[in-house]
Regions:
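Post-cleavage N-terminal segment of exported redox proteins
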Residues: 1-27, 73, 100-104
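Short pre-active-site segment immediately N-terminal to redox-active cysteine/selenocysteine motifs
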Residues: 27, 35-41, 46, 77-80, ...
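Gly/Gly-Pro-rich "capping" loops immediately C-terminal to redox-active cysteine motifs
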Residues: 28-32, 44-73
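Axial heme c-ligation environment in periplasmic c-type cytochrome domains
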Residues: 50-58, 73-104
Length: 104
């Protein structure tokens, strides 16, 4: 009986330990999808802008701002960037930002 309890406890512990990584991977996949659909048109698939006015994400300087500042920028728009309020939800924007931070 004790060995069965130990096995169940071990299984639950391993399951709990792996859950955040799985969630993170799914968030990055969602972020990649959102980024490729909405952001890459100007910021490029690899974070190097395809239009001169778009900031580079390859250097990461623009992405060092706090998440909520960047979410507001995306929602409200900036200079030539259109607003995405009503188009993207906050969690989609965050996923795209987290994905953009992985670009090199």
């Amino acid at each position: 009986m004790k060995s069965r309890i130990a096995r169940v406890a071990l299984f639950l512990g391993l399951l709990a330990a792996s859950a955040p990584q799985t969630v993170l991977a799914l968030d990055l996949l969602r972020g990649q999808r959102v980024y490729n659909m909405h952001c890459s048109v100007c910021h490029g698939l690899n974070g190097v802008p395809v239009i001169q006015q778009a900031p580079s994400f390859a250097t990461k300087e623009r992405l060092m701002q706090p998440d909520m500042v960047l979410v507001q920028s995306v929602k409200m728009g900036k200079t030539i960037m259109p607003p995405f309020m009503g188009i993207l939800k906050d969690d989609e924007i965050l996923d795209a930002l987290h994905y953009a931070r992985t670009l090199r």
